[in-house]
Amino acid sequence: FAGGIVSQRCLSCICKMESGCRNVGCKMDMGSLSCGYFQIKEAYWIDCGRPGSSWKSCAASSYCASLCVQNYMKRYAKWAGCPLRCEGFAREHNGGPRGCKKGSTIGYWNRLQKISGCHGVQ
């Protein structure tokens, strides 16, 4: 995974939560496609600075997709006032800008912590 403000362990847990940390291709989710290891939507990829050659090819690369997550968190997590630890990052990943403040992302965080090796992840 790419380095950045999100710890490697946290990235691994988000990856496991989204796809079992496999390139699972694209799936329709809430009216738009989510792709790859981190189930990245095209708008998220644009917000993370469009790394790689295209949205779908980046999402299909664990390194590029993790770089996108790192860039997204650098852009939004602090701005949104999220706690700069895994809970804030995971909820932001799930809920978009200001996702860490949305009640709808609490269940995502609780499910992520039940993944083997992810309880109490920072």
UniProtKB/Swiss-Prot annotation:
Disulphide bond pairs: 10-86, 13-118, 15-21, 26-35, 48-68, 58-64, 82-100
Coiled-coil regions listed: none
Keyword Secreted: yes
Entry annotation: catalytic residues: 18, 29
Domain I-type lysozyme: 3-118
Record field: pH dependence: Optimum pH is 6.5 at 37 degrees Celsius for bacteriolytic activity. Optimum pH is 3 at 40 degrees Celsius for chitinase activity.
Molecular function terms, GO-annotated: chitinase activity; lysozyme activity
Isomerase is among the record's keywords: no
Record's catalysed reaction(s): Hydrolysis of (1->4)-beta-linkages between N-acetylmuramic acid and N-acetyl-D-glucosamine residues in a peptidoglycan and between N-acetyl-D-glucosamine residues in chitodextrins
Record keywords, A-Z: Antibiotic, Antimicrobial, Bacteriolytic enzyme, Disulfide bond, Glycosidase, Hydrolase, Secreted
EC number: 3.2.1.17
Residue positions binding substrate: 41-47, 72, 93-95, 102
Gene Ontology cellular component terms for the protein in this record: extracellular region
One biological process term in Gene Ontology: defense response to bacterium
Family: Belongs to the glycosyl hydrolase 22 family. Type-I lysozyme subfamily.
Record's function text: Has bacteriolytic activity against Gram-positive bacteria M.luteus. Also has chitinase activity.
Complexes and interactors: Monomer.
Note: Unlike Ruditapes philippinarum lysozyme, catalytic activity is not affected by variation in salt concentrations.
Name this protein carries in UniProt: Lysozyme
Native organism taxonomy: Eukaryota, Metazoa, Spiralia, Lophotrochozoa, Mollusca
